Amino acid sequence: MGVYGCMNFAYANGLVRSHISGFISGGDMTPIAVDLWNVMYGLLEKLYPGKIDGVDDSIITLRCLYCLLRLLHQRSYYPVFVADRGFYGNGKTLYGAKAIAATCIATRGGSGRLHARLFDECGSTDVGEARCKRKHPGKKVCRWSERFETPKILYQLCMSIIRYMGYPYVDAGTMEADDICANLFHTKTVAYVLSSDTDLILMGCDIIIDLTRIFPPTIYCRDVLAALQMDYFTFLLNFVRCHTDLHREPTLKSMQEIINLSSAKRCLHDTDCATDDDVPRCIRPLYEEQDRRTGENSYHSEGFDLHIRKDQSKTSCWDNDVSNYTDTNLIRGVQKALKSLRPPRTRCEILEYKFIKHVIATIIPERRTSRVSILKRFPIMQEGRDETAVEDLIFCNIFDVDEASTIVSQFIKRIPEVRPLNHILLKYWGNDALKTTRSND
């Protein structure tokens, strides 16, 4: 899931850093958004890597959830839980990458003006040559969470326990968890997103990969941009082809394939590339070569070029705080660059065009006046702790009285009471938490 090859790229280039939590550094709790299903199945794979016999799914679900809550408390993280398809898990996703892909496939690209020949054009262009060299296995590799013997996480049981324990959560039945997490991140509600899904990097978020380590590994979007030497919009434009929810083989490309292919094209068309060592290798739009043959404009207009940060060192980029990074590098130039997008011509371009528009609408503030821009945050629900409801719910789902009593004791006695969300936001963000508007001048 996510951006194909992004995790390998991050580890290969030293972009995965250890995050010192607030508890270890002596600070207050750090608000983070938790992509619940991604994290729960990650814990499930660590706790139960093999086949399990004779253990009910409700017991496994509650054990994993208790482990998650304990880890969050020990690392001094304050979670805002986000799950797909709303609180009850029965909503229909209308927005996001999966919904865009499903809609475009159902409507043959989303537009009747496209000729059938163009639907297969993206698979036959030279941008797919690098993938043709890869050896494809004869049998499709099944993910661990999709195996028959893998235990199932009970959706409603998880969310009900989270609600009765007093944790904040988001109930958005028509949205994917990734989009909600990105919204919480860019509205300065949370500082990080707990998820191993790298498409959050494509949406400009900083992600914590693994909570089980004492110093959780973290990938910062600004570090990825600095390593690639590009601004956010150029990053989104080039690597949307790596999104696994939008593309499949052979259209799907890895990050390294995009980098290698674009660097090779640059060397072919720039005569100074092989001789001038001071010029950094940069990435060109995916459709640049195709547009040169057809004589049409690229996704970039002639006046919009790749932003090379020659004067910005890696250290200075790491030292930038979240608000400065978000306001400066993510918002500036996106509205201008959005106007340079040309109408798509192929099915792949339609998918990518709609996803780019969706991402920008999700994370970029809407300009209301010349000085004020507003980005609305999804409503966050939080109720008081109800230990009686927690106990009743556990005993209703677990028939073994001894096991149920043990789990009830763990949740009630070892999980401390959750403080109000507004109190955490005020202590972490300061006066910024009181602002409902953000200026991007």
UniProtKB/Swiss-Prot annotation:
GO terms for molecular function: endonuclease activity; RNA binding. Its EC number is 3.1.27.-. It is found in: Virion. The keyword Transmembrane helix does not apply. Belongs to the herpesviridae VHS protein family. Minor structural protein that acts as an endoribonuclease during lytic infection. Degrades host mRNAs in the cytoplasm by cutting them at preferred sites, including some in regions of translation initiation. This is Virion host shutoff protein. It comes from Gallid herpesvirus 2 (strain Chicken/Md5/ATCC VR-987) (GaHV-2). The gene is MDV054.
